[in-house]
C-alpha cells in the first residue's frame, strides 16, 4: 500500500478561523477528515502533520526519506522564501505536490514568487481544499 505524507505549514491549523473570505469556513479538522476519507477511497495510507516551524517541516521531509511514496505539502508563507524546505524536498527525491488553498498568483505580489515549488513535481493552487484531493489522486497513481 502506498504511503503519502501530507505536510501543512504555518497557520493552516487556523482554517475556518482566519480570513474566511480567502480560505473558506472549513476547519483544519475538516480538512484532515477529508484527506483521510480520500486516502481510504484511494486505498493509500496517509500521515498528516502540521507545524508553524520551518525546521520541523524540514525534519519531517528528511525523516520520510525511503519511507513514503509521495508528499503533499502546503508550505504556507514559507513557499515564498524557504530555501531550507526547497533543499529538503530536493534531497529526498520523493514525488511532491505543492498545494495552496487560494490562488496565490491572484493575491499580493509577494505571493507570486514560489521558492519551494522548484522542489516539487507540480503545484495546485486556487481550488480550495479540493487541491489536496487532486494531489492525493495524482500521487496514488504514480
Located regions from the model:
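Extreme N-terminal starter segment of soluble prokaryotic enzymes
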Residues: 1-4
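Glycine- and acidic-residue-enriched helix-capping/strand-helix junction motifs
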Residues: 15-29
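Short beta->alpha junction loops
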Residues: 47-55
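Short acidic active-site motifs
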Residues: 56-60
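Short acidic/histidine-rich motifs immediately flanking catalytic phosphotransfer sites
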Residues: 64-71
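Helix-loop-strand module that forms the ligand-binding subsite of alpha/beta enzymes
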Residues: 73-111
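Short, glycine-/small-residue-rich phosphate/pyrophosphate-handling segment
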Residues: 97, 105-142
Amino acid at each position: 500500500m502506498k504511503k503519502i505524507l501530507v505536510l501543512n505549514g504555518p497557520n493552516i491549523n487556523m482554517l475556518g478561523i482566519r480570513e474566511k473570505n480567502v480560505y473558506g469556513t472549513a476547519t483544519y479538522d475538516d480538512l484532515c477528515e477529508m484527506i483521510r476519507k480520500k486516502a481510504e477511497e484511494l486505498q493509500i495510507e496517509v500521515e498528516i502533520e502540521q507545524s508553524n516551524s520551518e525546521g520541523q517541516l524540514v525534519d519531517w521531509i528528511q525523516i520520510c526519506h525511503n519511507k513514503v511514496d509521495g508528499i503533499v505539502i502546503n508550505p504556507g508563507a514559507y513557499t515564498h522564501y524557504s530555501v531550507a524546505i526547497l533543499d529538503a524536498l530536493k534531497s529526498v527525491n520523493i514525488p511532491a505536490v505543492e498545494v495552496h488553498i487560494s490562488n496565490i498568483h491572484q493575491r499580493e505580489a509577494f505571493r507570486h514568487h514560489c521558492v519551494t515549488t522548484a522542489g516539487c513535481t507540480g503545484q495546485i493552487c486556487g481550488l480550495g481544499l479540493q487541491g489536496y484531493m487532486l494531489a492525493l489522486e495524482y500521487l496514488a497513481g504514480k
